[in-house]
Amino acid sequence: MASHKWLLQMIVFLKTITIAYCLHLQDDTPLFFGAKPLSDVSLIITEPCVSSVYEAWDYAAPPVSNLSEALSGIVVKTKCPVPEVILWFKDKQMAYWTNPYVTLKGLTQSVGEEHKSGDIRDALLDALSGVWVDSTPSSTNIPENGCVWGADRLFQRVCQ
């Protein structure tokens, strides 16, 4: 039963990503940062953080019409200065790095949309709500050249 709830939450989450991507067409906030061909999902963890090789990445959205059918998994890398959220497509052997702020906000909203309570939902809501309580409004735009994300002010841009 718990696995069914998780599946339903992921479907809602993927719909939220799709909606956010459609909104991207009208907004300057990109959802997808870059794409890279990788033969195995385990290679995602060994990749350097996007922020350290930013210029080398191609901007691309997954070439699929229905993310929920083609998506094989979601990886969250927390070892980077800014956590990274990566969508993995096994059939295409491609990984797509997403805007972590937009993606995590979509995850928070999708978990919150389910009206039935359950152990998994409650645990996720508790964990995710703590993240957003103390956060200040921040730009989800990609930093311009010469800008870095300050470690002490993770959610603010620092430009020289």
Swiss-Prot record:
Give the membrane topology, semicolon-separated if more than one. Peripheral membrane protein
Q: Which family does it belong to?
A: Belongs to the herpesviridae glycoprotein L (gL) family. Alphaherpesvirinae gL subfamily.
- The name of this protein is Envelope glycoprotein L
Question: What keywords are assigned to this protein?
Answer: Disulfide bond, Fusion of virus membrane with host cell membrane, Fusion of virus membrane with host membrane, Glycoprotein, Host cell membrane, Host Golgi apparatus, Host membrane, Membrane, Signal, Viral envelope protein, Viral penetration into host cytoplasm, Virion, Virus entry into host cell
Q: Signal peptide position in this chain? A: 1-22
Q: Which GO terms describe its cellular component?
A: host cell Golgi apparatus; host cell plasma membrane; membrane; viral envelope; virion membrane
Residue ranges of every copy of the gL alphaherpesvirus-type domain listed in the record? 28-160
Q: Which organism is it from?
A: Varicella-zoster virus (strain Oka vaccine)
* Keyword Isomerase in record: no
Q: How does it assemble?
A: Interacts with glycoprotein H (gH); this interaction is necessary for the correct processing and cell surface expression of gH. The heterodimer gH/gL seems to interact with gB trimers during fusion.
Q: Which domain of life is it from?
A: Viruses
Which HAMAP family does this one have?
HSV_GL_alphagamma (MF_04034)
- Write out the annotated subcellular location: Virion membrane; Host cell membrane; Host Golgi apparatus, Host trans-Golgi network
GO terms, biological process? fusion of virus membrane with host plasma membrane; symbiont entry into host cell
Name the job this protein performs: The heterodimer glycoprotein H-glycoprotein L is required for the fusion of viral and plasma membranes leading to virus entry into the host cell. Acts as a functional inhibitor of gH and maintains gH in an inhibited form. Upon binding to host integrins, gL dissociates from gH leading to activation of the viral fusion glycoproteins gB and gH.
* Annotated Gene3D superfamilies: 3.30.390.170
Pfam families linked: Herpes_UL1
- The segment annotated Interaction with gH runs over 24-149
Q: What is its main location?
A: virion
Q: List the disulfide bonds.
A: 49-80, 147-159
